[in-house]
Amino acid sequence: MGNALTFLYGKCCKPTTTDDSLGPHGVSAATVGVSALAHDLFNFEITSQVPEGLGRYVQSSRKAQANWYRKILEAWKQAKPPPQTAEEASRLVTDILKRNQKADVEGLLSFYGLPLSHTLVEVTVEAPVSLPEGILFEFQTLPVDPKAVADGDTITVYVSTSEPVVSSSVPREVNLAAVQRAKAREKRNYPKADELHQKIIDSGYRVLNIENEEVLARKFRIRLRGIDAPESQMPFGKEAQEGLLKIVGRKSLKVLVYGEDQYGRCVGDLYCNGIFVQEAMLKKGLAWHYLAYDKRPVLAKWEKEARQKRIGLWASSNPEKPWDWRKNNRRE
């Protein structure tokens, strides 16, 4: 069995002890999708049997279904890296079965809860060669804590004090506290170490454990420039937050900072593994183009594409604009 399928099966698809936690393919509801498909491919290679429930979703015979799984299994093994997201798995299946009936392909995707081909979006995978006009500075973040994604357009990141943009401005007392904390931990004086760490945190810094190495880092709150996602309390607010989390969670980001907003947040463009995060959010229908603060035509173009496909928040005929919602729900 290929390593990718073995890993996904072992990590994501172990049976749980309660029936309530199982999804339609014998795995937890949270893993239905990529890992469920990997689970069934794993079983198919061993038994040559396709899932029992698939026949309710497709029209073709079980013999034809077995042929699909054989092709998908081979393509999955050859993919480097193998699919890790629902979108990647959907593209692989759609490409391999492109000569089959559309109803069968969409039925197979629906069986696994994977996005249908017409809802997939293509995102540019390249960072700018030169800095756009108006950039004040840039930095590379440490991996993003999933808990730090507040909503669909705001995240908190940490930047190592070894980064040039940060290194020259670290307060002396923060550096001193970091050294003293390390010594306290060596002596197993953890109460003292915790007290010193709190002092560091209160100053806008934190000591993070990155790959078993302690890194002193500065905290930045980032507002994604040019987009406005639904607020957490709005319809589709949770989906927008989860969409951004899927893109940036546990990954390092390249941030191009244009300035600071009235709340002290850095306003910037975000790149994750070469993907322009705002582009992904707009194309997936997870945010509006914030025209009042960013006139870039390409942002309007990406929003228009999502509107035409009626994906994400655009599945609603008249979604409420975040800025209108904030105006009508101002805090006293």
UniProtKB/Swiss-Prot annotation:
Activity control mechanisms: Inhibited by Zn(2+).
GO biological process: DNA catabolic process; RNA catabolic process
CC cofactor: Ca(2+)
Cofactor remark from the record: Binds 1 Ca(2+) ion per subunit.
Gene Ontology CC terms, in alphabetical order: plasma membrane
Membrane topology of this protein: Lipid-anchor
pH dependence: Optimum pH is 7.0-8.0.
PROSITE patterns: TNASE_3
Induction: By hydrogen peroxide and cold stress.
Cell compartments where the protein resides: Cell membrane
UniProtKB keywords: Calcium, Cell membrane, Endonuclease, Hydrolase, Lipoprotein, Membrane, Metal-binding, Myristate, Nuclease, Palmitate
Pfam families assigned to the protein according to its UniProt record, in alphabetical order: SNase (PF00565)
Residue sites binding Ca(2+) per the record: 153, 228
Known partners and oligomeric status: Interacts with CYS6/CYSB; this interaction inhibits nuclease activity of CAN2.
Family statement drawn from the similarity comment of this UniProt entry: Belongs to the thermonuclease family.
The protein's name in its UniProt record: Staphylococcal-like nuclease CAN2
Originating organism: Arabidopsis thaliana (Mouse-ear cress)
